[in-house]
């Protein structure tokens, strides 16, 4: 435990020195597909998102695709919860262990909004029509242990956003590595998320009819035209994470995680999390996300979890719950269920 504390303190001190200096420009609001930045699962969110260095977790498909290389059997995980401003966030993951050939995973993420009134300048109370938004990410992941300490993984994703009759779409990749160091099991994870093409909205909502010369009569009064929208990049993340155990006994484990993140649309920041594990049955978690982020609203996060081996089968049922504080925007409660066959 002493050596784990030394390593963790050293890592935090280096990162704090780097991130304590605010960047002159955060580039906030310059990327699209913001739903890709939402923490997927309850376990990871309960630890403040500090899981890039964790191993054998199915939700690592989102955080670091290399971390699923140690997954055993067939795993299924899904969740559905209310996001901010009455939106709904849903996800599903499937992981399949191929033995020495590695692990493959499939994932789907969806963020949707309820119907709302279509309003215009001339009809601010509504035209009688309704619109909604829908974001989708569907991906395929492959991860493999290259040695007994080092794993490599990657994901290929299709990303789409819809607003009423307009759509933007592109493709992206995630790449990650995970290395278990010889220093008392401390693990180092590195990942790049959402490296891909730019997106812009296109569809019949951009089609208009205009009169190019309103001062003259008798000319062509209506010309079909299209609003030309701009391309915007995806929210790119570079993560470096450390994880390990302060305490590791037969009945009790206290694990930690600390992630340093460099996004392309905000200032650099740290995530820190802890997980107390009692006999692999009961889990208590806490986290501090977005440390040193400029103008952050995120507060502490908390979580609990439970493993249950279904009678007369080898199926493991896992239930995870987390509570995340978003300051003036309220709290987000996550609940997800996992099965491992």
Model-derived features with residue positions:
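Subset of outer-membrane beta-barrel
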Residues: 18-341
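Bacterial Sec-dependent N-terminal signal peptides
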Residues: 1-23
């Amino acid at each position: 435990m002493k050596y784990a504390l030394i390593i963790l303190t050293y890592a935090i001190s280096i990162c704090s020195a780097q991130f304590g200096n605010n960047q002159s420009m955060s580039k906030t609001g310059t990327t699209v597909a913001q739903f890709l930045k939402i923490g997927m699962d309850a376990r990871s969110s309960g630890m403040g998102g500090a899981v890039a260095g964790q191993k054998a977790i199915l939700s690592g498909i989102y955080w670091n695709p290399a971390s699923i290389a140690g997954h055993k059997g067939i795993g299924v995980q899904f969740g559905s919860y209310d996001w901010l401003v009455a939106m709904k966030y849903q996800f599903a993951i499937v992981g399949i262990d191929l033995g020495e050939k590695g692990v493959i995973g499939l994932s789907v993420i969806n963020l949707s909004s309820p119907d709302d009134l279509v309003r215009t300048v001339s009809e601010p109370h509504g035209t009688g029509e309704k619109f909604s938004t829908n974001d989708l990410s569907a991906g395929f992941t492959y991860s493999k242990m290259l040695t007994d300490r080092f794993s490599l993984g990657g994901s290929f994703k299709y990303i789409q956003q819809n607003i009423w009759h307009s759509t933007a779409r592109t493709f992206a990749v995630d790449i990650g590595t995970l290395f278990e160091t010889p220093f008392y099991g401390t693990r180092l994870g590195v990942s790049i998320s959402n490296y891909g093409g730019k997106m812009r909205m296109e569809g019949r909502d951009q089609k208009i009819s205009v009169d190019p010369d309103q001062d003259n009569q008798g000319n062509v009064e209506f010309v079909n035209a299209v609003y030309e929208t701009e391309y915007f990049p995806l929210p790119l993340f570079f993560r470096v994470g450390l994880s390990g155990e302060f305490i590791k006994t037969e009945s009790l484990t206290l694990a930690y995680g600390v992630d340093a993140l460099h996004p392309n649309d905000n200032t650099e920041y740290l995530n820190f999390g802890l997980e107390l594990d009692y006999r692999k049955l009961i889990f208590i978690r806490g986290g501090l996300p977005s440390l040193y982020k400029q103008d952050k609203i995120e507060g502490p996060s908390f979580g609990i979890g439970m493993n249950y081996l279904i009678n007369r089968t080898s199926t493991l049922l896992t239930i995870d719950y987390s509570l995340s504080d978003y300051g003036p925007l309220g709290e987000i409660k996550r609940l997800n269920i996992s099965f491992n066959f």
